[in-house]
A protein has these predicted regions:
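Conserved, well-folded catalytic cores of nucleic-acid-processing
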Residues: 28-32, 66, 100-101, 146, ...
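P-loop/Walker-type NTP enzyme "switch/lid" segment
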Residues: 2-23, 27, 34, 46-47, ...
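Conserved catalytic-core segment of NTP-binding enzymes
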Residues: 128-208
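Short boundary/hinge segments that flank catalytic cores
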Residues: 1-49, 54, 184-208
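Aromatic pocket-lining residues of Rossmann-like dinucleotide-binding sites
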Residues: 63
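Hydrophobic positions on the alpha1 helix immediately C-terminal to the Walker A/P-loop
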Residues: 55, 59
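Residues that mark the start of a beta-strand
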Residues: 39-42, 67-71
Length: 208
């Protein structure tokens, strides 16, 4: 279990203890590669505004520092945040690619070296069905040939089941919890959800 702050600390202060925590998380994931290839990881939280998007981006940065090629996809289609954090346009994104309204090359952005980003894109009415779609799974499978790591920013599990569904085609899941907002009962409920659906939890990150 790692404790980190809320900023893109790996860029602002790479020598900080929070940045070191992200490097520790990176090392833990890389060590797991000996047992199971960890190429697709979804990052979820229990509720909104717990820092999962910040965790996604910081983890992407520390991987990129090892010259690993990283793809970040915003699958929080109801409340997308990645484009806001990185000050990117969200005109077209993953929903447009899967909906055959745009090509991957048109949509993918590179805000930092070795970090590619696909924003959520055009708002769609059936987010859960979208995340369960074979088209999305096939798209992610195809991208695995090009990237060392794919990070999925998924919706909170306490609000919708999208993150649990996405976990079924990911190699591992990281749970982000705000240390001052979650109670034991809520965490136990999420733990039960994970066990029932056999989610492979590879880490828990506590945000301040």
């Amino acid at each position: 279990m790692l404790r980190v702050g809320e900023e893109l600390i790996t860029i602002l202060d790479p020598e900080s203890s929070a940045s070191e925590a992200y490097r520790t998380l990176r090392t833990n994931i890389l060590m797991r590669n000996f047992d199971r290839d960890m190429k697709v990881i979804n990052i979820i939280s229990t509720t909104a505004q717990e820092g999962k998007t910040t965790c996604v981006l910081n983890l992407a940065m520390v991987y990129a520092q090892l010259q690993k090629k990283v793809l970040v996809i915003d699958l929080d289609l109801r409340m997308p945040t990645i484009h806001k954090k990185l000050k990117l346009k969200n005109k077209k994104g993953i929903s447009d690619i899967i909906g055959h309204q745009a090509e991957f090359e048109e949509v993918v952005l590179q805000p930092y070296e070795n970090v590619d980003v696909i924003t959520a894109g055009t708002k769609i009415p059936f987010a859960s069905e979208f995340i369960q779609s074979n088209a999305l799974k096939e798209f992610i499978e195809e991208r695995k040939k090009e990237y060392d790591l794919i990070l999925l920013d998924c919706p909170p599990v306490g609000l919708v089941t999208d993150g649990i569904v996405a976990a079924s085609y990911c190699d591992g899941t990281i749970l982000v919890c705000a240390s001052n907002r979650n109670d034991r009962k809520e965490l136990l409920r999420v733990k039960d959800q994970f066990e029932q659906t056999q989610v492979n939890v590879i880490g828990i990150v506590m945000t301040m």
